Amino acid sequence: MNIGVWLSYDGTRYDGWQKQGNTDRTIQGKLEAVLEKLEGSTVEVHGSGRTDAGVHAEGQVANFHLAKSMDPDGIMRYMNRYLPEDIAVTRACVMQERFHSRLNAVRKTYRYQIETAPKKNVFERCYYYGLGQELDVGKMEQAAAILSLIHI
């Protein structure tokens, strides 16, 4: 059975989405470890995209196949019980067998946040880039005009 899950995570403590041989601090690795305990065998989790180290996600879709037939809500409760507190499954459902979260993705939204205050907010430092000065909107508009002419 093909299960789709919607995820939110604070990526501060992680080395990105993709499982890596030199670290167990990845989102994919944490998900697969929990699911392997549930399934009793290896489970490969496919994400709709890969985030870099320290990057957060809200509403990221992933999918995985289980040999056992299980209730999606039960899977979600199990995962949330055993995942670290900075990773949450917010929704789970049975998907069509051919569904693949990356190949069937229709949209991704990225949000970049810049803090322009001269002093950093220590409680939000992981969620903003601390520039420490006002943005020069005129220069940004000039750069955007140049970039709009470049075709890659």
Segments and roles (model prediction):
Residues 1-151:
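Structured-RNA-binding interfaces characteristic of tRNA pseudouridine synthases
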